[in-house]
Amino acid sequence: MSRIAILLFVAFLLVAGISAKSTAHFKKNVLADLFKERRFNAKRDPAGSTCVNIDVDSFCDGMAERGACNIIPQMATNCAKACNSC
C-alpha cells in the first residue's frame, strides 16, 4: 500500500511540475509579446491611415490607424478588414 502511495505522490509532483513550467513559459511569452507591442508603438508613430473599419476588433483598428498595414506584411492577412476597408 505504501508503494502505491509513494508512486502516486511522485506522479502528482511530476504533473504539478510540468504544468507549472508550461504556465510560466506561457506567461513569459505573453509578457514578451506585450512589451514588443509597446516598443513598436513607442518607436513608430506614423501619420496614420484614414481608412479604418470600425467593425473589426480594436487591435487591428489601432494598428491600421498607426499605418502598420504598410509597415508589417502580416497585417495584410491578419487584419485584412481593417487594412482594406477603403
Swiss-Prot record:
Keyword Secreted in annotation: yes
Top-level taxon in the UniProt lineage: Eukaryota
GO CC terms, sorted: extracellular region; nematocyst
Keyword Metal-binding: no
Boundaries of every ShKT domain copy: 51-86
GO molecular function, one term: toxin activity
Main function: Inhibits voltage-gated potassium channels (Kv1/KCNA).
UniProt protein name: U-actitoxin-Avd10a
